[in-house]
Amino acid sequence: MKAALGVLLLLAGCAATPEACPTGAGQATIAEAYFGRNVKGRAPVTDAEWVHFMQEIVTPAFPDGLTVLDGNGQWRNAAGRISREDSKVLVLVLPGQDQAAASARLAPVTAAWKTRFAQESVLTVFRAGCAGF
C-alpha cells in the first residue's frame, strides 16, 4: 500500500500544472473557429450573409466581444488535388473558462453554420492561455 501511494505521489508530481499568468492577466481559453465560405451548388457565402450570421447567431452567443479575421486556406483532397477556400476566422478569448466549456459554448454556432450553409465541418481550435485587459 505504501509503495502504491508513493507511485501515485510521484505521478502527481509529473502532471502538468498550468503556469501562473503574469500580473494583471488571468487564465483563459482561446478558441478559434474557421468558417469556410464555399458552398456546394451555389455561390460562396457573401459578406451580407456573414454579417447576418454574426448578428443572429454569433454575437448573441458571445456578447462580451470577439474578433473576426479574413482567411484563405487550402488542403489536399484524397485525389491529391489542392483545394482553396476563403474563410472567416472567429477568435474568442474566454477568461475563466476551460476548453470543455468553450467548446460547449461554440458548438451551437458551428452547428448553425453547417446547417445554414450545407457545410461538412468547421475547424475549431482550443488552447489555454492568459488574458488581461
Model-predicted segments: where are they?
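Bacterial signal peptide processing site
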Residues: A15-T17
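Terminal, regulation- and interaction-focused segments at domain boundaries
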Residues: A28-D47, L90
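Bacterial N-terminal signal peptides that target proteins for export
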Residues: M1-L5
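Mature extracytoplasmic domains of secretory-pathway proteins
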Residues: E49-S87, V93-A100
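Glycine-rich, aromatic-bearing surface loops/beta-hairpins
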Residues: A20-A28
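C-terminal motif of bacterial Sec signal peptides marking the signal peptidase cleavage site
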Residues: L10-G13
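Helix-rich interaction surfaces within compact, conserved domain-sized segments
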Residues: I82-F133
